[in-house]
């Protein structure tokens, strides 16, 4: 979400939304109407005096009752603020609902939406993409009237970056800026940092409270602990680079000695009893958006993706080298000739990619406890954020303005075992 703010037509600079008249649809007539409405509410016979006070750009009218001195306890403060308009694409939030926030609609991507585009252009909204390229992000912003800014002096409303900002950049952010990363959010996105944070919470709160990850070890420093665990269970383990994505560099092992020692990796116990659909392994991608870490405010999207392997699952050590059996990543399985594409957006339960809704409908038809499963998945996601809350919040406190300027979208990969228990993969 991007806060809409007043803009200068001369130089294109954007003023703070906290300025006296920077809210959407604010004009003098509406403020006069608000004052008139406030006075009409009061009984004119009981009003002896009225004084106008200004505090944080919000005007208040304090009414005193001259004829009833004993009723001073009934005196009240009537906030007189800019009257919110019902302008399409604008949602009013904050104290007294005086902060306008621009909302985005997915329908604007599918077809031209003149109202949304006009709104963005009216307020001279702009964006910058840094260290990344995304056709989807460009299309969404363009459909809502955002113009790409080539200016490097901070004259933009939204900065979408592929990395994190430096401390010097965080300190110069203005009120109208929105950034798509929180400082130090790699505490949850890097596999090694996530494992360390979850282990810390397991020590503090108990293993049963934060048993959301398969047992994981960070190598080379925890190699002996891995060997001890392997001696007890004798099960396959899965090796992952610390900061990779799309299934790159992932492989399974039958013994710790098979792990190369040339680079740091995260080794996790392989979930060898996955819940299968028609004999195929799958995982679920769930998206969550965080708008604040103090307090923690997160939104879990009700829809998601289900990604299937392209080779039927067979347990044991014999088939550990078959990536298309054990890994569900699209980037891995799309190379297999068995991969089935779905070219019909209206069909959600066909091919190697389903929607989460289609999966839940299928499970419900089979008599599964879908509600319980989704509650457990939600619990895993919430506890993941609680595990990283302390280090991220400590960094955010060094840059207080980040709390109102940053947001972040996260993707959670969840696998379900044959006991209908969800596990966080990354």
Model-derived features: where do they sit?
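Cytosolic, low-complexity regulatory segments enriched in Ser/Pro/Gly with interspersed Lys/Arg
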Residues: 1-118, 124, 181
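Generic detector of isolated residues embedded in canonical secondary-structure elements
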Residues: 4-8, 35, 40, 44-45, ...
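Compositionally biased, intrinsically disordered low-complexity segments
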Residues: 17-20, 194, 335
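Solvent-exposed, charged interface segments at domain starts and junctions
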Residues: 61-91, 149, 199-203, 208-229, ...
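Charged, low-complexity, helix/coiled-coil-prone segments
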Residues: 73-85, 128-144, 165, 171-175, ...
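Conserved N-proximal alpha/beta basic substrate-recognition cap immediately N-terminal to
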Residues: 84, 88-236, 243-245, 255
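Catalytic core of tubulin tyrosine ligase-like
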Residues: 215, 225, 233-234, 238, ...
């Amino acid at each position: 979400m991007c806060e809409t703010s007043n803009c200068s037509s001369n130089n294109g600079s954007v003023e703070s939304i906290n300025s006296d008249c920077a809210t959407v649809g604010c004009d003098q007539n509406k403020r006069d109407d608000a004052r008139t409405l406030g006075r009409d509410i009061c009984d004119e016979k009981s009003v002896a005096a009225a004084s106008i006070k200004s505090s944080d750009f919000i005007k208040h009218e304090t009414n005193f009752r001259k004829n009833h001195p004993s009723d001073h306890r009934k005196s009240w403060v009537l906030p007189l603020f800019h009257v919110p308009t019902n302008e399409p694409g604008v949602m009013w939030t904050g104290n007294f609902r005086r902060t306008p926030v621009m909302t985005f609609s997915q329908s604007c991507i599918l077809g031209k939406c003149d109202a949304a585009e006009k709104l963005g252009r009216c307020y001279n909204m702009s964006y910058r993409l840094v260290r990344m390229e995304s056709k989807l992000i460009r299309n969404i912003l363009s459909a809502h009237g955002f113009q790409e800014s080539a200016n490097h002096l901070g004259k933009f409303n939204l900065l979408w970056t592929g990395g994190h900002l430096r401390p010097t950049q965080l300190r110069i952010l203005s009120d109208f800026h929105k950034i798509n990363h929180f400082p130090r959010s790699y505490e949850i996105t890097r596999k090694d940092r996530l494992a360390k944070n979850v282990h810390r919470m397991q020590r503090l709160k108990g293993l049963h409270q934060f048993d959301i990850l398969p047992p994981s070890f960070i190598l080379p420093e925890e190699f002996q602990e891995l060997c001890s665990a392997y001696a007890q269970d004798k099960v396959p383990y899965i090796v992952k680079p610390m900061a990779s994505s799309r299934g790159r560099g992932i492989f399974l092992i039958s013994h710790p000695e098979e792990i190369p020692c040339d680079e740091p990796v995260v080794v996790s116990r392989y979930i060898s009893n996955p819940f299968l659909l028609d004999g195929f392994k799958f995982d679920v991608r769930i998206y969550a958006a965080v708008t604040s870490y103090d307090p923690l405010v997160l939104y879990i999207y009700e829809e998601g993706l289900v990604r299937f392997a392209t080779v039927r699952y067979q347990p044991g050590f014999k088939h550990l080298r078959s990536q298309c059996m054990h890994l569900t990543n699209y980037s891995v399985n799309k190379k297999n000739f068995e991969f089935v594409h779905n070219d019909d957006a209206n069909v959600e339960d066909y091919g190697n990619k389903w929607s989460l809704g289609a999966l839940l409908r299928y499970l419900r038809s089979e008599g599964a406890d879908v509600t319980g499963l989704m509650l457990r998945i939600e619990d895993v996601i919430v506890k993941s954020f609680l595990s990283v809350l302390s280090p991220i919040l400590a960094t955010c406190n060094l840059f207080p303005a980040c709390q109102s300027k940053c947001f972040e979208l996260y993707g959670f990969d969840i696998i379900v075992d044959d006991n209908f228990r969800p596990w966080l993969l990354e």
